[in-house]
């Protein structure tokens, strides 16, 4: 089987979802295919969460990591309004533009069910703590934050999926084995089932679970790879005062 599309997106995490959302908005009627090795939003179920097992049994396809919504689908949904941490987009565009995009994404989340309530660490108490931290050469980063909550996070993703599901073609539970550059400048992807999909544009957003696979694909395509810096977070819990 061989089928042609305008755009093929690999991965239905946040990057893939919003790419599909924006393409439909900016180019209505675009012929778009989104592929993910996990299930749709309705059928993601971890056996630990459902109470079937007590510890990870290493499912061939992890429903916590894969499927519509990506690895963040079952998170508590914290949305940070800052460029101080969480990425390096300011290396490629002005900070003002990045903040406008952050606000825009938030508006889409609100449109699909997110709360409008935000929390801020720009408080006298936080400023005092920041001053104390500096005395020990520790730099406390402040930001406005929105807490979506796990259940609301899933509902937002479900609403977004239902908004775009009938506008694009989705292939869930489908693993891509190879990305190929065609002589005419187009791209083709080959699935585990032997299906071939070609496209004028390819957006690869395989997420954390597909990072190693994608790195190998890039090497096969002759693309240069750069090491990304890693943020290490430490969670410190203190007794309530």
Regions inferred by a protein language model and the residue ranges of each:
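Dinucleotide-binding Rossmann-like beta1-alpha1 core, especially the glycine-rich loop
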Residues: 67-119
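Residues forming the flavin
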Residues: 2-86, 124-241
């Amino acid at each position: 089987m061989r089928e042609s599309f305008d755009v093929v997106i690999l991965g239905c995490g946040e990057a893939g979802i919003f790419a599909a959302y924006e393409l439909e908005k900016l180019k209505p009627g675009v012929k778009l295919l989104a592929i993910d090795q996990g299930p749709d939003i309705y059928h993601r179920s971890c056996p630990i969460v459902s109470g079937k097992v007590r510890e990870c049994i290493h499912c061939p396809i992890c429903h916590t990591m894969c499927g519509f919504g990506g690895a963040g689908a079952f998170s508590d949904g914290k949305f940070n309004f800052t460029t101080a941490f969480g990425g390096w987009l300011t290396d490629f565009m002005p900070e003002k533009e990045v903040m406008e995009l952050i606000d825009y994404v938030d508006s889409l989340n609100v449109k699909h069910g997110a709360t409008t309530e935000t929390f801020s660490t720009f408080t006298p108490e936080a400023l005092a703590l920041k001053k104390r931290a500096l005395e020990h050469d520790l730099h406390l980063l402040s930001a406005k934050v929105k807490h979506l909550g796990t259940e609301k996070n899933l509902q937002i993703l479900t609403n977004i999926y239902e908004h775009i599901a009938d506008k694009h073609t989705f292939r869930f539970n489908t693993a891509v084995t190879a990305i190929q550059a065609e002589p005419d400048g187009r791209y083709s992807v080959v699935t585990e089932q032997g299906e071939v999909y070609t496209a004028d544009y390819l957006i690869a957003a395989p997420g954390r679970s597909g990072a190693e696979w994608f790195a190998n694909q890039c090497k096969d395509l002759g693309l240069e790879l750069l090491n990304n810096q890693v943020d290490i977070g430490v969670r410190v819990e203190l007794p309530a005062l």
